[in-house]
C-alpha cells in the first residue's frame, strides 16, 4: 500500500507542484470527508496545508464535468512534478484556471479566467500578463520565468481543449 498513491492522498498532501490540486480547483471539485463536504476553493489553504482537521479523512472527490478542459505542465526533468502547471476548465458559468508549481500552493488565475471567459482562445490567454510578485523563485526557475510560463501554458491548454 505504501507504494500506491491516490487522488485523495495527493489532495490532502497539497504539494505545491502536484497536478491533482490544479484539476480539483479548476473543475470546482468538492472534497468529501468522513464528516463534511469542502469546496476546492476553500480546501487548499497554504503550502502542504489544507482545510482538513488532523483526524479527518477524505472519502470521495466529486468532479463536475466541464464543457471543455485541459491541463498543460512544464515538468521538472528530475521529478516530473510541475515547474508550472495550468489547468483550464470551460464551464457553463465561465472559465476557471488553476495554476500549480508556481506559488506556495495551487491558486486560481483570475485575470486569465476573465480573459478566457470573454474569448476562449489561445491568443486571449497569451495576452494576459501575470505578476511575479507572489510566485516562487528557487534553483529551478525564477518567479519571473514562472510568470511567463503561466499564460503560455494556458494558451496550450486552450488549444488542447478546443481540439
PLM feature spans:
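C-terminal structural segment of proteins
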Residues: 1-163
Amino acid at each position: 500500500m505504501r507504494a500506491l498513491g491516490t487522488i485523495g492522498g495527493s489532495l490532502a498532501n497539497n504539494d505545491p507542484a502536484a497536478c491533482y490540486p490544479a484539476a480539483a480547483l479548476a473543475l470546482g471539485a468538492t472534497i468529501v470527508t468522513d464528516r463534511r463536504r469542502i469546496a476546492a476553493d476553500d480546501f487548499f489553504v497554504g503550502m502542504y496545508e489544507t482545510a482538513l482537521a488532523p483526524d479527518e479523512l477524505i472519502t470521495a472527490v466529486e468532479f463536475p464535468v466541464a464543457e471543455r478542459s485541459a491541463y498543460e505542465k512544464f515538468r521538472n526533468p528530475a521529478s516530473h512534478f510541475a515547474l508550472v502547471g495550468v489547468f483550464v476548465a470551460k464551464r457553463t458559468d465561465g472559465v476557471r484556471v488553476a495554476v500549480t508549481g508556481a506559488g506556495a500552493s495551487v491558486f486560481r488565475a483570475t485575470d486569465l479566467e476573465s480573459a478566457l471567459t470573454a474569448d476562449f482562445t489561445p491568443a486571449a490567454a497569451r495576452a494576459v500578463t501575470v505578476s511575479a510578485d507572489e510566485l516562487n523563485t528557487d534553483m529551478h526557475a525564477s518567479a519571473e520565468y514562472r510568470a511567463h510560463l503561466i499564460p503560455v501554458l494556458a494558451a496550450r491548454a486552450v488549444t488542447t481543449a478546443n481540439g
